[in-house]
């Protein structure tokens, strides 16, 4: 990783170029640090260039305590596996997260499992990824994600905006405005996969819409578009797929 605020308060990361193999910036709440220092809050990230073979900004997956009041703004996402990824896995709450004015690209990188110790990258080129799903073999309550906003994002991508909870841990109050996605093949890897690592669902085949939402309450998408610069069998014909979503209003248009 590049920079990892773990159970920190009142942090400003500004005017940085972060280039990493793993995640560029990770905001998290590990078990020992959560017990010692408590809430992770008031984290501002602005005016940065972020390059990673995983997420540009990752919140989680270690979420033993509360993470709140995190902003990411005015940044360039430079060829990352994901632009923004938010996970809960360990019973904590992630809330009041605000992302705005990002531009750049996301793509799927090749995994190298054949080489001992080589990484398997998380992410398949998603501009937005939010996940509240249990870890494999975990008996811990998953946790809560609520009050997350995205505003003014322009991303060339290889996969969808992915929002996924479970019936017992639904995402709440997710608002997206002025998200503009251009689907374009940039790497060499095939698509058609959803990647929910680390979780009981793991990685599995699925046609890729522009927006996928599962178990979300109060989802709002406004003034957003998707354009397909390339053709791929992995990309679904429908723009949106909603499963078990309530109180949702989605305005996402396909443009030429």
Give the ranges of each region predicted by the language model:
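Extracellular/periplasmic carbohydrate-active domains that bind, remodel
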Residues: 1-256
């Amino acid at each position: 990783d590049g920079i990892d605020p773990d159970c920190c308060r009142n942090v400003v990361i500004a005017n940085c170029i972060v280039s990493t193999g793993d995640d560029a910036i990770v905001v998290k709440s590990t078990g020992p640090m959560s017990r010692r220092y408590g809430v992770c809050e008031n984290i501002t990230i602005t005016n940065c260039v972020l390059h990673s073979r995983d997420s540009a900004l990752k919140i989680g997956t270690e979420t033993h305590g509360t993470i709140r009041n995190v902003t990411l703004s005015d940044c360039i996402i430079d060829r990352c596996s994901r632009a923004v990824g938010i996970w809960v896995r360990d019973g904590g709450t992630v809330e009041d997260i605000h992302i705005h004015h990002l531009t750049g690209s996301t793509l799927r990188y090749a995994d190298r499992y054949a080489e001992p110790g080589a990484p398997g990258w998380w992410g398949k080129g998603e501009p937005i990824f939010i996940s509240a799903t249990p870890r494999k073999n975990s008996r811990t309550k998953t946790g809560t994600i609520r009050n997350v906003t995205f505003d003014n994002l322009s991303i060339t991508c290889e996969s969808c905006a992915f929002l996924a909870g479970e019936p017992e841990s639904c995402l709440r109050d997710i608002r997206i405005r002025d998200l503009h996605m251009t689907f374009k093949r940039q790497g060499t890897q095939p698509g058609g996969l959803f990647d929910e690592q680390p979780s009981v669902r793991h990685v599995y085949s699925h046609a890729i819409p522009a927006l996928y939402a599962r178990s979300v309450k109060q989802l709002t998408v406004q003034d957003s578009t998707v354009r397909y610069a390339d053709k791929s069998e992995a990309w679904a014909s429908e723009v949106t797929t909603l499963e078990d979503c309530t109180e949702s209003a989605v305005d996402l248009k396909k443009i030429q």
